[in-house]
Amino acid sequence: MGTVRAARLCGAILGFLLLQGAFGKPSLITEPLSSNTGNSSSSEPRSSSSPASAGTPDTSQNITPISTTMSLRIREDSTILPSPTSETVLTVAAFGVISFIVILVVVVIILVSVVSLRFKCRKNKESEDPQKPGSSGLSESCSTANGEKDSITLISMKNINMNNSKGCPTAEKVI
């Protein structure tokens, strides 16, 4: 169930990164050009109006409709950012996927080690009788996660003393 959630989260993150790369381009504002209402620029020659041409329309200026003539202008207050290329989007996506895979591998290794240690501790506890004087200290060391460290060391020292019945009295000083 956890892997299904992780897969959904990964898909959501990758989708977000791809959408951000696709729509993260700087915005351009289109504004219509101003129409010529009698004021012509200084570079265009003015036609002199003669009495013969007064009744005919002036064809020296080609006036196009405003709706078809559009110019792309960028606002002065906004900064121009370079548009993300497909290489940068792929690099970011690849980095995210690789980091997600590394995190998953670390979590799986930790879970496998914890489960294997629990299985070994349970197997050792079932196979060995804790009442036997010759039992090893391995089964006691598995229960250190419960916070019984002091009693475990005393039990293991007791087992050492019972194994070495005529042995050394200095075993108690080692604690």
Curated annotation (Swiss-Prot):
Spans within the Extracellular topological domain:
25-91
Keyword Transmembrane helix recorded = yes
Q: Does the keyword Glycoprotein apply?
A: yes
Give the UniProt entry's GO cellular component terms: cytosol; plasma membrane
**Chain spans, region Disordered:** 33-66, 124-145
Per UniProt, what is the membrane topology? Single-pass type I membrane protein
- Give the signal peptide, or none: 1-24
Q: What is its main location?
A: membrane
Arranged from A to Z, the UniProt key words for this protein are: Angiogenesis, Apoptosis, Cell membrane, Chemotaxis, Cytoplasm, Developmental protein, Differentiation, Glycoprotein, Membrane, Phosphoprotein, Signal, Transmembrane, Transmembrane helix
The segments annotated as topological domain Cytoplasmic are 113-175
Residues carrying Phosphoserine:
S165
Q: Which residues cross the membrane?
A: 92-112
Q: How is it modified after translation?
A: May be heavily O-glycosylated.
Q: Where is the composition biased (Low complexity)?
A: 34-60
One Pfam family assigned to this protein is ECSCR
InterPro entries per record: ECSCR (IPR026247)
GO annotation (BP), single = positive regulation of proteasomal protein catabolic process
Q: Where is the composition biased (Polar residues)?
A: 133-145
Where is the protein found, in the record's own terms? Answer: Cell membrane; Cytoplasm
Q: What does this protein do?
A: Regulates endothelial chemotaxis and tube formation. Has a role in angiogenesis and apoptosis via modulation of the actin cytoskeleton and facilitation of proteasomal degradation of the apoptosis inhibitors BIRC3/IAP1 and BIRC2/IAP2.
How it assembles, according to the record, is:
Interacts with FLNA. Interacts with the 20S proteasome subunit PSMA7.
Q: Which family does it belong to?
A: Belongs to the ECSCR family.
Question: What is the protein's name according to its record?
Answer: Endothelial cell-specific chemotaxis regulator
- Organism, by scientific name, is Canis lupus familiaris
